[in-house]
Structure formats: structure tokens, C-alpha cells
């Protein structure tokens, strides 16, 4: 929630939260949408996507229950195991954007999935560590 709040503040946009309860590993049930998403284009943030169940369930709730106009998801790590690709393909998500912290598998073919490179930032961080310069300034 803290990361989403920080993004909302930087973008000067309102914040909504999808409250979910995890019943067991790799499954969750969407419980509530806290905030108004009706007729809005939603950016859904998560740390990682494994099987895609939570992400796709949240997107579905945002559209069907919350009335969102569209949903784009962003996550740091795309594990994408099991049914993840098919779930994303079949979902209401318009686009899913991952960082390339986990290499994209060549067999993964889904027009909704995009990757952003972290190579330049990692290289800069390594250089700063070597030069004994603050790495935290990269993120301010």
C-alpha cells in the first residue's frame, strides 16, 4: 500500500485499494474495492505475478464491480508460472508491464505483456557502489 500511495502522490492521482485475502499459496479471493474507480483508467500495481490469479481477479473486480474503464497492470517481477499467460490473455487487463528482472521465456507469447529494462539502472547502481556514491539518490 505504501508503494501505491507513493506512486499516486507522484502522479497526483487518487488511490484505490483492492482488498484481498489469500486462502492458500497461489490463490486469493478479492474481497473489496476501497476507493472510487468508476469510469477511470486504473493502474494496478503489484510486486510480482506468479500464476496471475490475484492480478486477473483484481482486474476483473475493478471492471465488473468497480466500473473501471480500463486496467493496466505493472509488476516488478513476472514469474508467470502455470496458467499465468492464459489467464492474462483471457483477462480484462489491457496491458501488463513487467521489469526484466526475470528473463522473458521465448515461448511466452502474449500481446498484452510488455517488458521494461532495468539494465541501465543496475549499471548505474554498480558504478555508484564502485565509486562510493549514494545509490539511494537514483530513486529520489
Predicted regions and their residues:
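PRPP-associated nucleotide enzymes
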Residues: 1-140
Amino acid at each position: 500500500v505504501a508503494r501505491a500511495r507513493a506512486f499516486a502522490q507522484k502522479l497526483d492521482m487518487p488511490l484505490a485499494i483492492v482488498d484481498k485475502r489469500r486462502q492458500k499459496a497461489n490463490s486469493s479471493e478479492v474481497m473489496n474495492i476501497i476507493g472510487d474507480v468508476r469510469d477511470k483508467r486504473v493502474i494496478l500495481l503489484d510486486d510480482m505475478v506468479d500464476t496471475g490469479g490475484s492480478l486477473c481477479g483484481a482486474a476483473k473486480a475493478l471492471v465488473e464491480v468497480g466500473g473501471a474503464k480500463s486496467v493496466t497492470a505493472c509488476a516488478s517481477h513476472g514469474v508467470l508460472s502455470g496458467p499465468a499467460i492464459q489467464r492474462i490473455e483471457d483477462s480484462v487487463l489491457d496491458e501488463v508491464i513487467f521489469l526484466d528482472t526475470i528473463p522473458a521465456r521465448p515461448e511466452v507469447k502474449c500481446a498484452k505483456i510488455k517488458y521494461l529494462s532495468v539494465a541501465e539502472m543496475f549499471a548505474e547502481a554498480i558504478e555508484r557502489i564502485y565509486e562510493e556514491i549514494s545509490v539511494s539518490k537514483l530513486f529520489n
